Curated annotation (Swiss-Prot):
GO cellular component: host cell membrane; membrane
Superkingdom of origin: Viruses
Gene coding for it: US13
Keywords: Host membrane, Membrane, Transmembrane, Transmembrane helix
This protein's record includes keyword Transmembrane: yes
KW ATP-binding (keyword) present: no
Family named by the database record: Belongs to the cytomegalovirus US12 family.
Main localization, broad class: host cell
Protein name (database record): Membrane protein US13
Biological source species: Human cytomegalovirus (strain Merlin) (HHV-5)
Membrane-spanning ranges: 37-57, 68-88, 95-115, 121-141, 150-170, 180-200, 215-235
């Protein structure tokens, strides 16, 4: 005759439940470690590549005064980010594809930053990483076995501080178009912070262990998107660039070729 099962309120069940929760936490923690190690690796590659090119070719920093087309590269990470989000788990978890994303965004970021200056780039880099760490930290304060109370508190505090800061800066802005640009930036960044917040929760609780590359891409591409959008706000010289110079070099060479024929 089989021995009777222990009662649901018995110490044996409590120990088994605690062990089960501990094993689940270890599995999720291993996934998180892999995802965020990949994110740090992607950021390190992009930072090293962009730093070497940006500092190694100083003559190219004024390229946007004659050719404004690098500004269009602000849309590159946004399109890739939407692609990764829309495809979801159907997106290939492939090393070659992931490194292709990192390489493409690193190259476009170099051309894009040539339209700005070093102080704005460094401030932007620090600000975006701080926002990302704050969003990620707000999610990681609570785990999947506890109430989401701390997540709610941290997210509301972070949102309040962000919008109060934005309102103070906007109130001191003289020109109307600058205020519109600043508030538009705030709306976009708030949307991206919200996606980052819930995306981090998804990675923490639900991301399959076989999809760590896709999880790291979600975070990395979102960071590059925030970096490029923020750089526009921190670089007033970009607001005054004439859009008539977009593809100016291509149009001039085309006209010369057409004139010669």
């Amino acid at each position: 005759m089989d021995p009777p099962l222990p009662s649901l309120h018995s110490p044996q069940w409590a120990s088994l439940l605690q062990l089960h929760h501990g094993l689940m936490w270890l599995r999720r923690f291993a996934v998180l470690v892999r995802v965020y190690a990949l994110v740090v690796f992607h950021i390190a590659i992009s930072t090293a590549f962009c730093g070497m090119i940006w500092l190694g070719i100083p003559d190219s920093h004024n390229i946007c005064q004659h050719e404004s087309s690098p500004l269009l590269l602000v849309f590159a990470p946004s399109l890739l980010w939407c692609l990764v989000l829309i495809q979801g788990e159907r997106h290939p978890d492939d090393v070659v594809l992931t490194m292709g994303y990192v390489g493409l965004l690193s190259v476009t970021t170099v051309f894009y930053t040539w339209c700005s200056d070093l102080p704005a780039i460094l401030i932007d880099y620090t600000l975006v990483l701080t926002l990302w760490i704050a969003c990620t930290g707000a999610v990681m304060v609570g785990d999947s076995f506890r109430a989401k109370r701390w997540e709610l508190i941290c997210s509301r505090v972070l949102t309040s501080v962000f919008f109060i800061t934005l309102w103070v800066i906007g109130d001191q802005t003289v020109f109307h178009h600058q205020r519109i640009l600043l508030y538009g930036y705030g709306a976009i960044v708030f949307l991206m912070m919200t996606v980052t917040f819930y995306g981090t929760r998804y990675i923490r609780d639900e991301l399959p262990a076989a999809q760590t590359l896709r999880g790291s891409l979600l975070i990395y591409v979102g960071l590059v998107t925030m970096f490029k959008i923020t750089l526009i706000v921190l670089s007033p010289n970009l607001w005054r660039l004439p859009w008539t110079t977009v593809f100016a070099a291509f149009r001039s060479s085309y006209c010369e070729g057409g004139g010669g024929s």
